[in-house]
Each structure stands twice: as structure tokens, then as C-alpha cells.
């Protein structure tokens, strides 16, 4: 089964809205139970790390339960990174469907997120690479690789920033 460009675009816009509106449960439902979420780090040679199991990553969750735990901490104020509460605006551009076959869609897109906290606006930007399972009624994210392109991060970065 293939999915249209417009359907993928709307799916990604919905994910961005869920993050901006703090609709955590709806956001989690967009991920398959075995979905990976990975933000590799830049190494000393200015190259992205390639293996989340053996090299440093900015974020690594091997399945959705890691994301669920993160959301639990955010919602129950057990996350100093989210106190005081932040406000975000996610913006998506340059969406490309790279490959489609047998209910799988691979895509990439650029993003820019503005984050307001402590009377300051921070800008985060990068490129995401996603794999979607398109076999069901609605797509599910089975893998997301977030390439953060900022050289300097003034404070912590979290799943809702990207």
C-alpha cells in the first residue's frame, strides 16, 4: 500500500501540532510499539555518530516505552528540563518521500522549532529521517532519526524540541 505526499505531510503536521499543544498521548499513538527514536551526536571530527548502542547520542529510545517514560516524567513534573513549562512552534519544510514499498514509506524533511523558556527564544533546526508503516488505517512511525544541526545548545534538548 502506498501513501500520498499530502497524507504524509498532514501526518507530520499533526505530529508537530500534538507536540506544540502538549497532546502527549495522541503524539505517542503516532509511534509503533517497537519504534526507535534516535538523535545522534556530532563527534570531534564533525561527523554524526553511527551506532546508538556503542557511541554517544543526544537522544536514544529503542522502542516506544522509552518515549512513554519520557512523557510520564514531563506530565508529572518529574523532569527539571521541562520546569518551567516551555512553549514551542514546530515548522516543517522540504518533505521528500524517498522510497515506498510493501506498506513502508521512507521520508526526510527539514524542521525548525522555536522554543520559549526563561524569557528567551531558542531556535533548533535540522533534518528528520522517518520510516512509516502504512499498512493500517493511519500511518505509524517505526523509526525516526533526528539530525540536529545546531552547533551550540544553551540548555537541554528534549523530544518536544524536535
From Swiss-Prot:
Its EC number is 1.14.12.-. It comes from the Bacteria. It holds the Pfam family Ring_hydroxyl_B. One of its GO terms (biological process) is 3-phenylpropionate catabolic process. GO terms for molecular function: dioxygenase activity. Pathway: Xenobiotic degradation; toluene degradation. This dioxygenase system consists of three proteins: the two subunits of the hydroxylase component (XylX and XylY), and an electron transfer component (XylZ). This is Toluate 1,2-dioxygenase subunit beta. It comes from Pseudomonas putida. The lineage of its organism: Bacteria, Pseudomonadati, Pseudomonadota, Gammaproteobacteria, Pseudomonadales. The gene is xylY.
Amino acid at each position: 500500500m502506498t501513501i500520498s505526499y499530502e497524507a504524509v505531510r498532514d501526518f507530520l503536521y499533526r505530529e508537530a501540532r500534538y507536540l506544540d499543544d502538549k497532546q502527549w498521548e495522541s503524539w505517542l499513538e503516532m509511534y509503533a510499539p517497537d519504534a526507535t527514536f534516535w538523535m545522534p551526536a556530532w563527534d570531534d571530527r564533525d561527523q554524526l555518530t553511527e551506532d546508538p548502542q556503542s557511541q554517544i547520542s543526544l537522544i536514544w529510545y529503542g522502542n516506544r516505552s522509552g518515549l512513554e517514560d519520557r512523557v510520564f516524567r514531563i506530565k508529572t513534573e518529574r523532569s527539571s528540563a521541562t520546569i518551567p513549562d516551555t512553549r514551542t512552534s514546530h515548522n516543517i519544510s522540504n518533505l521528500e518521500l524517498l522510497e515506498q514499498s510493501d506498506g513502508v514509506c521512507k521520508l526526510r524533511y527539514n524542521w525548525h522549532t522555536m522554543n520559549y523558556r526563561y524569557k528567551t527564544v531558542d531556535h533548533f533546526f535540522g533534518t528528520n529521517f522517518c520510516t512509516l508503516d502504512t499498512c493500517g488505517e493511519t500511518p505509524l512511525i517505526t523509526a525516526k532519526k533526528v539530525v540536529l544541526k545546531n552547533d551550540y545548545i544553551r540548555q537541554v534538548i528534549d523530544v518536544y524540541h524536535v
